Amino acid sequence: MDIKLKDFEGPLDLLLHLVSKYQVDIYEVPITEVIEQYLAYIATLQAMRLEVAGEYMLMASQLMVIKSRRLLPKVVEQIDPEDDPEMDLLDQLEEYRKFKLLSEKLGEQHDERANYFSKPKLDLIYDDVQLAKDKTVIDIFLAFSKVMAEKQASLRQSHATIARDEYKIEDMMDFVRSRFETGPRLELRQLFQESQDVNEMITIFLATLELVKVHEIVLEQTETFGDIYLVRSEDESLS
């Protein structure tokens, strides 16, 4: 199965998406939290064996430098803004935000004209998966990134080392369906409580997306960065 996420135009676009969730001025966002979310997102894509462009990895290394500097003791000397990688990053984000707004306005004008002459492009991707309150598939991946990081830490502590590769999405779709036998709603992280390795978690996650895509379940996230819940569709029987 080919998986394609929402196309970001580059690492700044991904960072701007994360920053926008806080609904505050760019210079007031909790940058350490944003960095951790970015790194978790990239790590999840790598674990799922999805290709990550070099520019995203370069940004990841720069973010790790910024994060490490924040962990160091504060120094008395005034830091030159030109030598501050954190301020430089925020400046880049602000400039990119302005550029993106202008590009979107121009794009809307172009699309208006194009609709009269051509058919819109159809992509078979998971970007059409929508959550409540205007959430997107990227929010699902961010939530899954957090769950997977927690589960990996737990597996390391329990010294679990057995990994299998033969998990099938079809089987895991049946597994997800079975979890609704006790009720119509469950938390995403509950699906992974008994997972024994990362491959199993990834297959369960992909199975969940597939069930959303075929409208057997819907996903809800009632607050930014909050837990995601799976809700059985009223139009489908999952038993």
Curated annotation (Swiss-Prot):
One of its GO terms (biological process) is cell division. It is found in: Cytoplasm. Gene3D superfamilies: 6.10.250.2410, Structural maintenance of chromosome 1. Chain E. GO terms for cellular component: cytoplasm. Pfam families: SMC_ScpA. Its main location: cytoplasm. Coiled coil: none annotated. InterPro entries: ScpA (IPR003768), ScpA-like_C (IPR023093). It comes from the Bacteria. Keywords: Cell cycle, Cell division, Chromosome partition, Cytoplasm. HAMAP family: ScpA. Component of a cohesin-like complex composed of ScpA, ScpB and the Smc homodimer, in which ScpA and ScpB bind to the head domain of Smc. The presence of the three proteins is required for the association of the complex with DNA. Belongs to the ScpA family. Participates in chromosomal partition during cell division. May act via the formation of a condensin-like complex containing Smc and ScpB that pull DNA away from mid-cell into both cell halves. This is Segregation and condensation protein A. It comes from Streptococcus suis (strain 05ZYH33).
